[in-house]
């Protein structure tokens, strides 16, 4: 059975892991603030590149341990399915790459938990590389409504993916993070079905709102801040927002 506590009952935990959908993060900040005390470490395993700053702005960045999770899953209703044998798991580390006592404490906890994990001395680059992967592989698929095989079988789908990723790489460089040498994403047709659908398309299929604000929305804001054009991500944001409105019945006239 699950052990569920109110924020007040959980006050002062050693480690708090934040794993909510992006649209629910702002609404979770009050609870996070109530749980955290002076010694609490907070890990956000959410996608995107700004959840740590959003949380840290409320509770103080000294609490934050940068982290991300790599897991291929499929959500149906309230059920999430994944293959633990091929799941990479949690990556975490200090922003400065140091192997601090906090890193050692989390490692000690995870060693006894069965959680798959990796300690990273370059966690910010890993977070941005995953961000580029999500934008370049999640969004074209969601716009076109195709399985993963579209990237292999259509030069046009792959071109959209490449142009979206190029914008992420340019913004990352402006922020001070170089992901140019990160390998392009691909898939092994022997182990991954060309019918596979990533989370944004899964959300649209189920008529749920997506996390496109966390992907292209944040990139547009950062691009504007640093003077980097992001036209492909601007179009992707508009298209996916329009698909959300269509799913909501706002203009579906069939």
Predicted regions and their residues:
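Rossmann-like NAD(P)(H) cofactor-binding subdomain of soluble oxidoreductases
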Residues: 1-81
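A general structural signal for well-ordered alpha-helical segments in protein cores
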Residues: 13, 25, 51-52, 103, ...
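NAD(P)-dependent Rossmann-like dehydrogenase/reductase catalytic/cofactor-binding core
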Residues: 162-254
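Internal alpha-helical scaffold of NAD(P)-dependent oxidoreductase catalytic cores
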Residues: 34-35, 58-63, 78-130, 135, ...
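Electropositive phosphate-/nucleotide-binding environments in soluble metabolic enzymes
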Residues: 4, 26, 49, 100, ...
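Glycine-rich beta-alpha junction loops
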Residues: 47-49, 68-73, 96, 123-127, ...
């Amino acid at each position: 059975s699950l052990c569920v506590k109110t924020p007040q009952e959980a006050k002062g935990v050693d480690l708090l892991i934040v794993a909510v959908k992006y649209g629910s993060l702002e609404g979770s900040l009050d609870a996070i603030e109530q749980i955290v005390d002076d010694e609490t470490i907070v890990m956000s395993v959410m996608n995107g590149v700004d959840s740590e700053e959003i949380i840290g702005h409320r509770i103080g960045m000294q609490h934050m341990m940068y982290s991300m999770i790599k897991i291929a899953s499929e959500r149906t209703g309230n059920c999430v399915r994944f293959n633990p044998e091929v799941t990479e798991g949690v990556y975490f580390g200090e922003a400065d790459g140091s192997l601090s006592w906090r890193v050692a404490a989390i490692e000690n906890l995870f060693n006894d938990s069965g959680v798959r994990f990796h300690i990273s001395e370059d966690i910010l680059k890993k977070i941005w590389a995953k961000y580029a992967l999500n934008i370049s592989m999640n969004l074209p698929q969601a716009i076109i409504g195709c399985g993963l095989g579209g990237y292999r079988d259509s030069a046009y789908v792959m071109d959209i993916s490449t142009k979206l990723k190029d914008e992420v790489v340019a913004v990352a460089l402006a922020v001070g993070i170089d992901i140019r040498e990160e390998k392009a994403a691909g898939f092994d047709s022997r182990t991954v079905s060309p019918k596979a659908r990533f989370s944004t398309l899964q959300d649209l299929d189920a008529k749920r709102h997506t996390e496109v604000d966390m992907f292209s929305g944040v990139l547009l804001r950062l691009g504007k801040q640093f003077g980097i054009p992001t036209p492909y991500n601007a179009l992707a944001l508009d298209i996916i927002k329009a698909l959300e409105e269509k799913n909501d019945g706002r203009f579906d006239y069939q």
